[in-house]
């Protein structure tokens, strides 16, 4: 997966590092970190990413708002978005998928599960 770039959006520095590490070390991708949805949107608006991984509950802008902005149009509207959250309720998953999330994973999540989801969405297998 060399030369592919992911945007990891989560307000937890530890989770951002864990996801970025998995993408970099296990999947061979570059990863940029963003601390909340607003930071993620700024970085997405000025960079090129093949996939976005986002939490839901974050300050300033939550992950669902970010998914909605991505899907509203523009150059990134077709970028796969993986929601990775502690929100395991079916109505939360349904909201995310209705807004346009490509996949929904519930924390705690294993690095291999994240990598497999990314590979599937990017059709790299």
What is each model feature region?
Residues 33-51:
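Acidic, metal-coordinating helix/loop segments flanking the phosphotransfer/catalytic sites
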Residues 48-50, 75-80:
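His-Asp phosphorelay/catalytic-motif detector in bacterial-type signaling
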Residues 13-32:
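Two-component/phosphorelay signaling modules centered on CheY-like receiver
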Residues 58-61:
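Receiver (REC) domain active-site loop signature in two-component systems and cognate sites
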Residues 109-118:
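C-terminal output helix
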